[in-house]
Regions:
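Structural core segment of the AMP-binding/adenylate-forming
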Residues: 1, 24-94
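Conserved AMP-binding/adenylate-forming
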Residues: 1-36, 160
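Conserved AMP-binding loop of ANL adenylate-forming enzymes
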Residues: 3-7, 147-173
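Conserved pre-ATP/AMP-binding loop-to-beta segment of ANL
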Residues: 78, 96-118, 125, 148-154
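Conserved structural elements of the adenylate-forming
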Residues: 97, 129-150, 158-159, 168
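Conserved S/T- and glycine-rich ATP-binding loop of Class I adenylate-forming
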Residues: 5, 22, 53, 113, ...
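Conserved AMP-binding A3 loop
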Residues: 114-138
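Short hydrophobic alpha-helices that are characteristic scaffold elements of the AMP-binding
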Residues: 20-25, 47, 163, 172
Length: 173
């Protein structure tokens, strides 16, 4: 609870599942643009003091180049390996194989931190913006109002989940 967990993934089902799972365990979810290089990853993972990163094996080349400068990063979960590789390189499949089919969400208070977004850095160093659980409710509500969505609609947001629009409307909405 309260740990910062980032995902560095393209539009895969695991991106959506992990984001919602992070919220479910009352951790703070962050997403990283899927084309980021080492410097952008280091800026955001280092500044946030992220404890865990969910990514793919093909991204490990970038991560390994900066890992020694991320002392708070304790775990990396890979979505495309069948078994844990070490105590700190874990398999998404192995971690989720016994997950419950029930979607039981614990009660949270509106002021509980939920999502950490970073600005693009167009005016300087990227800045972290912490959203609260009340904002998750508002994003869900506004996406229905703005996009005129109903329970019968299927919506696909083309924005990368590494940016606020992709998360707010592509995952939460």
């Amino acid at each position: 609870e309260g740990d910062i967990i980032f995902s560095f993934l393209p539009k895969t089902p695991e991106q959506f599942f992990s984001f919602l799972g992070i919220l479910k365990i009352k951790a703070i979810a962050g997403t990283l643009f899927s084309s980021f290089g080492e410097d952008a990853l280091l800026d955001r993972l280092g500044d946030s003091k992220a404890k865990c990163l969910i990514t793919r094996k093909s991204s490990m080349k970038k991560i390994n180049k900066i890992r020694d400068r991320l002392p708070e990063l304790k775990y990396i979960i890979l979505i495309d390996i069948p078994r844990h590789e070490s105590p700190d390189i874990l398999s998404y499949s192995q971690l989720t194989q016994n997950a419950s089919d029930l979607f039981a969400v614990p009660q949270t208070r509106p002021e509980t931190p939920s999502v950490l977004h970073y600005t693009s850095g167009s005016t300087g160093k990227p800045k972290g913006v912490l959203h609260l659980h009340r904002s998750v409710l508002h994003q869900s509500s506004t996406s229905k109002e703005i996009l005129n969505l109903t329970d019968k609609d299927i919506f696909w947001c083309t924005a990368d989940q590494g940016w606020v629009t992709g998360t707010s409307y592509g995952i939460i909405g």
